[in-house]
């Protein structure tokens, strides 16, 4: 079916388009301005609804029209003349059905629909609330104050999710009779309740002022909206909104938080990180016409790979692969990748370098190649260029997030983005950068605790909503919670982008004040250290109880035995799982397994730690007196970063549980073969299932298997070719070099570890992995040392290793390919050298993970 959407740039227009495309329909949108997020798979006509020729072009070939173009008040040019254009074009092109997003203020338009002789439905929406509302409703309620004249007037609302679902049904269900239907969430609000939830004071303002101030006049129009009877919606349509009025308001607070409305615009507060509500499409051409292209060779690119602008050619896997090892699942592409891209939008809005550079940062700070994550080094150069009086290369190298591997390729290619040419303009840019740097450093530092506390509360609320009778949620409710959880994860990554900017800035300042690379201790409240602390607490408890020691020494499953013979220790394990159960290896991969899913893994880690040599106490970093204030701020920001990361992983854990529940339901309904098929759909596809679900899942599973054998290089410029699947392993006497994070010299046998083989690691072995995240850190307790191919000194796992004194080397390029499994190696955590002492004997036990592919 082909569907024309008027008002396509609005909240409803964009949402409808995404849902309709997911279900396999063709969409053409018409609006005055094309949204940056408009998908390339949908047509778009940039024109006013009053342009009869453009409207007729949009209607040509359409089976049905979603008429979302209307304005507040009684503007005949849009509401009447525009609708007349649409109806005339439908009559001339043969389009026989129209769905209009109406309201109590649109009786004349509804009469036009009734008189036109076509099939029509007018969905009279109550005031639309929701976290992704970014229109006039957001601007009105983001005003610094709200008038108190109608404080106790009742107002009805509806969530944008419910509005979009009902509109899709009205568009596609042709047996629905023509006529209007009222849509409002159960329950009622008052303007006083709304103002209190949004933190806006209500002040007495006289009627003359209300009429003169445009925003207040619009609020007065809302006050006069009649209450709607939703009996028809419930009894004839059988539709029950997933959100009640109070929940709509709670969700809408996320749209207003960190923003203020002034005049006809909404601004983000400089000390808060606001919700990113819309992401630019990565495949759209730049404003100057340069079209992006895929960087990989024919047949090596994945469905979700990022086309790149040739003027921004250099990409690096270091650090970002810690977040999500690849090839990741499609579900992760719509959760973690979306979140990282939203973080890029946040960075672009903060730094504002303007022009194609700002747009590039917003679109491709993070990119995907062969379904693996990469960071844009060329864009990072321009981010660093906003720091006054410093060379960009110095800023990037001293940020702590990248290793020396980033220096192996040039930042620019044959084409370069435009730059400031005159000296005067460069000086003006420097003055501007001083202001931007100062506002971001001071503002974000000051607002960081509030952002973190608010996010913790958001995730706690999500968990309560999700796990309150999870199995009994109806499908609409479950789908809305899935979208809410996804968006909380996305906002977690936006907060992470703020932490990235602040941590990088503090690292550069510390480097300048100390004259060397300095990493201050984060202190005892480091949330990412909880897995290590949990293992250490359980080890201490086990050593106090001989029964526990005996049971942990036995093979096989131990948890049930502990429940019977050592109930106190069993309770301690369950208590630790309550704290860290959401974490685990590859913890931001949607299809991954957490400690809560496999508690025996945590018990086995405790048993192995009992047999390991304790790590020495880490040395206390020496901070010069002049640098101590900055070091304290840096440590606080580091702790904030880890809290945000922990809550974001918690939100992923909740989302994973919600998806598995929906996967179970679709398996019972015969849509899926197994519940885990749900991870091979995008989250947005879950709420608008594609036509051939089983075929799509099978194709994506096959693509993931194919991409597992196609590994892009760690760093490349312009284009990439797959890395060789095998390489000559190091021999005895050879040395591999990386970046030393912590610890002295230790010896042990090499164990190549991946998320699914973490259980194979034995006490005293060297944990060698492509990348480690915080979910691996419980295994640090019994590994002799940790070596990773990717990551920087400020990566999450490196921070934990430094806090506890675990020997650790990061950015050891090719470690999983060059270090022979089972070889005895000496790791120097200070210098970053890994020296091969002797190879594994031929008659010795073979260690798993001996393939040499990265």
From Swiss-Prot:
* Annotated SUPFAM superfamilies: NAD(P)-binding Rossmann-fold domains, Phosphohistidine domain
GO cellular component entries: peptidoglycan-based cell wall
- What Pfam families does the record point to? Epimerase (PF01370), PEP-utilizers (PF00391)
Highest taxon, organism lineage: Bacteria
One GO MF term: transferase activity, transferring phosphorus-containing groups
Matching NCBIfam families, A to Z? PRK05865.1 (NF004520)
User: Which PANTHER family does this UniProt record tie to the protein?
Assistant: PHOSPHOENOLPYRUVATE SYNTHASE-RELATED, PPDK_N DOMAIN-CONTAINING PROTEIN
| Record-stated family | Belongs to the PEP-utilizing enzyme family.
Name of the molecule in the record: Uncharacterized protein Rv2047c
The organism named in the record is Mycobacterium tuberculosis (strain ATCC 25618 / H37Rv)
Please name the taxonomic classification of the source.
Answer: Bacteria, Bacillati, Actinomycetota, Actinomycetes, Mycobacteriales
């Amino acid at each position: 079916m082909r569907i024309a959407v008027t008002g396509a740039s609005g909240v409803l227009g964009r949402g409808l388009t995404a849902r309709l495309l997911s279900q396999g329909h063709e969409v053409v949108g018409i609006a005055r301005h094309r949204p940056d997020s408009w998908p390339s798979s949908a047509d778009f006509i940039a024109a006013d609804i009053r342009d009869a020729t453009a409207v007729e072009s949009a209607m040509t070939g359409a089976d049905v029209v979603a008429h979302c173009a209307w304005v507040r008040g009684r503007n005949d040019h849009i509401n009447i003349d525009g609708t007349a254009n649409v109806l005339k074009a439908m009559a001339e092109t043969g389009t026989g059905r129209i769905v209009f997003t109406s309201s109590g203020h649109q009786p004349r338009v509804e009469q036009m629909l009734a008189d036109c002789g076509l099939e029509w439905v007018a969905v009279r929406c109550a005031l639309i609330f929701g976290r992704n509302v970014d229109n006039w409703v957001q601007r009105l309620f983001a005003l610094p104050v709200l008038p108190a004249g109608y404080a106790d007037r009742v107002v009805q609302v509806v969530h944008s999710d419910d509005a979009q679902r009902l509109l899709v049904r009205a568009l596609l269900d042709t047996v629905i009779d023509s006529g209007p239907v009222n849509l409002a969430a159960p329950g009622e609000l008052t303007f006083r309740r709304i103002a209190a939830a949004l933190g806006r004071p209500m002040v007495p303002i006289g009627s003359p002022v209300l009429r003169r101030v445009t925003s207040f006049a619009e609020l007065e129009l809302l006050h006069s909206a009649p209450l709607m009877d939703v009996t028809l919606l419930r009894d004839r349509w059988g539709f029950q909104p997933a959100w009640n009025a109070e929940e709509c308001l709670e969700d809408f607070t996320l749209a207003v938080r960190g923003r203020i409305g002034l005049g006809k615009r909404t601004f983000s507060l400089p000390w808060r990180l606001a919700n990113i509500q819309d992401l630019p499409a990565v495949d759209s051409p730049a404003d100057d016409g340069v079209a992006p292209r895929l960087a990989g060779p024919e047949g090596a690119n994945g469905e979700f790979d990022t086309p790149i602008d040739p003027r921004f050619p250099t990409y690096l896997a270091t650090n970002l692969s810690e977040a999500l090892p690849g090839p990741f699942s499609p579900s992760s592409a719509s959760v973690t990748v979306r979140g990282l891209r939203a973080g890029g939008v946040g960075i672009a809005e903060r730094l504002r370098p303007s022009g194609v550079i700002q747009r590039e940062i917003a679109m491709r700070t993070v990119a995907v190649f062969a379904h693996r994550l990469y960071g844009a080094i060329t864009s990072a150069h321009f981010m660093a260029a906003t720091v006054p009086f410093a060379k960009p290369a110095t800023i990037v190298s001293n940020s702590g997030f990248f290793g020396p591997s980033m220096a192996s390729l040039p930042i620019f290619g044959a084409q370069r983005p435009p730059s400031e040419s005159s000296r005067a303009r460069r000086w003006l840019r420097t003055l501007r950068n001083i202001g931007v740097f100062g506002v971001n450093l001071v503002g974000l530092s000051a607002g960081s605790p509030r952002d973190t506390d608010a996010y913790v509360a958001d995730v706690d609320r999500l968990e309560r909503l999700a796990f309150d009778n999870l199995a009994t949620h109806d499908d609409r409710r479950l789908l809305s919670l899935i979208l809410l959880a996804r968006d909380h994860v996305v906002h977690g990554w936006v907060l992470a982008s703020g932490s990235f900017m602040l941590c990088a800035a503090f690292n550069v300042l510390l480097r300048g004040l100390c004259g060397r690379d300095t990493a201050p201790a984060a202190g005892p409240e480091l949330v990412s250290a909880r897995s290590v602390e949990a293992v250490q607490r359980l080890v201490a408890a086990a050593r106090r109880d001989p029964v526990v020691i005996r049971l942990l020494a036995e093979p096989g499953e131990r948890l049930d035995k502990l429940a019977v013979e050592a109930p106190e220790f069993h309770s301690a394990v369950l208590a630790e799982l309550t704290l860290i159960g959401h974490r685990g290896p590859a913890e931001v991969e949607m299809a991954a397994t957490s400690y809560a899913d496999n508690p025996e893994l945590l018990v086995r880690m405790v048993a192995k730690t009992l047999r390991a040599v304790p790590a020495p106490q880490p040395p206390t970093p020496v901070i010069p007196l002049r640098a101590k204030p900055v070091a304290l701020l840096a440590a606080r920001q580091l702790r904030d970063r880890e809290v945000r990361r922990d809550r974001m992983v918690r939100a992923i854990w909740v989302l994973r549980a919600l998806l598995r529940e929906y996967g179970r339901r679709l398996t019972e309904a015969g849509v899926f073969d197994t519940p885990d098929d749900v991870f091979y759909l995008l989250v947005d596809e879950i709420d608008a299932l594609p036509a051939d679900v089983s075929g799509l899942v099978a194709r994506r599973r096959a693509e993931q298997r194919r991409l597992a054998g196609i590994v892009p290089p760690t760093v490349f410029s312009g284009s990439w070719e797959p890395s060789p699947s095998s390489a000559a392993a190091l021999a005895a006497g050879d040395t591999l070099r990386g970046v030393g994070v912590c610890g002295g010299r230790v010896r042990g046998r090499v164990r190549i570890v991946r998320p699914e083989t973490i259980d194979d690691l034995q006490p005293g072995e060297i944990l060698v992995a492509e990348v480690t995240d915080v979910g691996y850190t419980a295994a640090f307790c019994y590994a002799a040392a940790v070596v990773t191919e990717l990551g920087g000194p400020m990566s999450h796992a490196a921070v934990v290793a430094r806090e506890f004194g675990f020997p650790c080397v990061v950015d050891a390029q090719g470690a999983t390919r060059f270090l022979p499994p089972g070889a005895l190696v000496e790791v120097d955590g200070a210098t970053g050298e890994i020296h091969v002492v002797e190879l594994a004997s031929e008659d010795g036990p073979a260690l798993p993970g001996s393939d040499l592919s990265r």
